[in-house]
Amino acid sequence: MAQYRVIKMLRKITEAQKEKALMTLELLTENPAGIGDHSTHDFYNNAEEAIKALAEADDVLDTIERYYPE
């Protein structure tokens, strides 16, 4: 039982990380006013970090689903 609580916790943490990455990409692409005083370099770095975080979250969720389907 505890094993599945750990998996449930990992799933929820990763889902939250995915939502954070999606929100960041949304702010960067659809709400330029939210960017503020960031330089172009900061903008690109933030976008790159967000897309990598999104890909990592998707990979983790896929792995959890493969080995511990709901």
Where do the protein language model's features map onto the residues?
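Extended, charge-rich alpha-helical interface modules
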Residues: 2-70
